[in-house]
Amino acid sequence: MNLIPTVIEQTNRGERAYDIYSRLLKDRIIMLGSGVDDNVANSIVAQMLFLQAEDPEKDISLYINSPGGSITAGMAIYDTMQFIKPDVSTICIGMAASMGAFLLTAGAKGKRMALPNSEVMIHQPLGGMQGQAADMEIHARRIIQMREKLNQIMAERSGQPYERIARDTDRDNFMTAEQAKEYGLIDKVIETPTK
């Protein structure tokens, strides 16, 4: 069951009901709270394009709590983040794993953040295939090409040498928010404000 909360807002024309994600979008907040597939990517890309049309000078915030997912779907989000004029700040809440970690690192430099108890996990692309040996070989080569492309982008975005990224993504590599900051995947850990 997928329950989406509704919020009621008072306006000069009366009450207005929004689903929570539409209300957050008014404040230029986009949520990635699931695996990354084509439908999720299309929704996020559309929201980014909409917000750019609304105000190309104002930042967009992308909150990430994702186990990762499809490389091609994630690259659609990544390319859009780099293409649009507004800076996209990224904030890890909970877990940013695999493609979720890649998108976290893709945020505007200086605007990549994580909450103190969140985690980041990087690893090499996963793939499963079946069929004729020749087709499996084609798919294996494609996964290796994608791994090299992702590692190159991660190296550029984190400031780490390509060789270290390749070594550190060979297996699942979990990091605390502070470790992700030291590694260069994010720029700051957001501390809970004191009252």
Curated annotation (Swiss-Prot):
GO annotation, cellular component aspect: cytoplasm; endopeptidase Clp complex
Role, per record: Cleaves peptides in various proteins in a process that requires ATP hydrolysis. Has a chymotrypsin-like activity. Plays a major role in the degradation of misfolded proteins. ClpXP2 is involved in the complete degradation of the Site-2 clipped anti-sigma-W factor RsiW. This results in the release of SigW and the transcription activation of the genes under the control of the sigma-W factor.
Oligomer status and interactors: Fourteen ClpP subunits assemble into 2 heptameric rings which stack back to back to give a disk-like structure with a central cavity, resembling the structure of eukaryotic proteasomes.
Family: Belongs to the peptidase S14 family.
Alphabetized UniProt keyword annotations: Cytoplasm, Hydrolase, Protease, Serine protease
GO BP of this protein: protein quality control for misfolded or incompletely synthesized proteins
EC number(s) given by UniProt: 3.4.21.92
Organism: Shouchella clausii (strain KSM-K16)
PANTHER family documented for this protein: ATP-DEPENDENT CLP PROTEASE PROTEOLYTIC SUBUNIT
TM regions (residue ranges): none
CDD domains: S14_ClpP_2
Keyword Transport attributed: no
Active site positions: 98 (nucleophile), 123
InterPro entries with a match to the protein in the record: ClpP (IPR001907), ClpP/crotonase-like_dom_sf (IPR029045), ClpP/TepA (IPR023562), ClpP_His_AS (IPR033135), ClpP_Ser_AS (IPR018215)
Protein localization: Cytoplasm
Reactions the enzyme catalyzes: Hydrolysis of proteins to small peptides in the presence of ATP and magnesium. alpha-casein is the usual test substrate. In the absence of ATP, only oligopeptides shorter than five residues are hydrolyzed (such as succinyl-Leu-Tyr-|-NHMec, and Leu-Tyr-Leu-|-Tyr-Trp, in which cleavage of the -Tyr-|-Leu- and -Tyr-|-Trp bonds also occurs)
Pfam families membership: CLP_protease
Molecular function terms, GO-annotated: ATP-dependent peptidase activity; ATPase binding; serine-type endopeptidase activity
Cleavable signal peptide: none
NCBIfam families to which the protein is assigned, alphabetical: clpP, PRK00277.1, PRK12553.1
Entry protein name: ATP-dependent Clp protease proteolytic subunit 2
Superkingdom: Bacteria
SUPFAM superfamilies given in the database record: ClpP/crotonase
